[in-house]
Amino acid sequence: MNPRREPRGGRSSLFDGIEEGGIRAASSYSHEINEHENERALEGLQDRVILLKRLSGDINEEVDTHNRMLDRMGNDMDSSRGFLSGTMDRFKTVFETKSSRRMLTLVASFVGLFLVIYYLTR
């Protein structure tokens, strides 16, 4: 056996333990830093998720409100359409009759009513 190799072998075995411990300490420290950074990033993501959840809830409420308003408006339009179609049917009935006497009476009554209202408000 070579005497020179034995001290190197002994020395390397001595320093191997120290280096491994140093590496282990550095890697555990690095692991703790990574864990801390991950926790901060997770908290930031959690805040964003909460904000998005609140925002989506507000959007949902706004959409529901608009849908109810549009439904009411549609119902009002349907009732107005029914009223106007009834009025148009009455006008058709009046104008389809060939009686000029009836038409003359209708026009004269409108003109007379207009004149009475005009003189009363004057």
Swiss-Prot record:
Membrane-side (Cytoplasmic) residue stretches: 1-103
Keyword Transmembrane helix: yes
Protein family per UniProt: Belongs to the BET1 family.
Protein name, entry field: Bet1-like SNARE 1-1
Organism of provenance: Arabidopsis thaliana
Source organism phylogeny: Eukaryota, Viridiplantae, Streptophyta, Embryophyta, Tracheophyta
Membrane topology: Single-pass type IV membrane protein
Gene field: BET11
Keywords: Coiled coil, Endoplasmic reticulum, ER-Golgi transport, Golgi apparatus, Membrane, Phosphoprotein, Protein transport, Transmembrane, Transmembrane helix, Transport
SUPFAM superfamilies, alphabetized: SNARE fusion complex
Entry function: Required for vesicular transport from the ER to the Golgi complex. Functions as a SNARE associated with ER-derived vesicles.
GO CC terms in record: cytosol; endoplasmic reticulum membrane; Golgi membrane; plasma membrane
Residue ranges constituting the t-SNARE coiled-coil homology domain according to the UniProt record: 32-94
Cysteine-cysteine disulfides: none
Coiled-coil regions listed: none
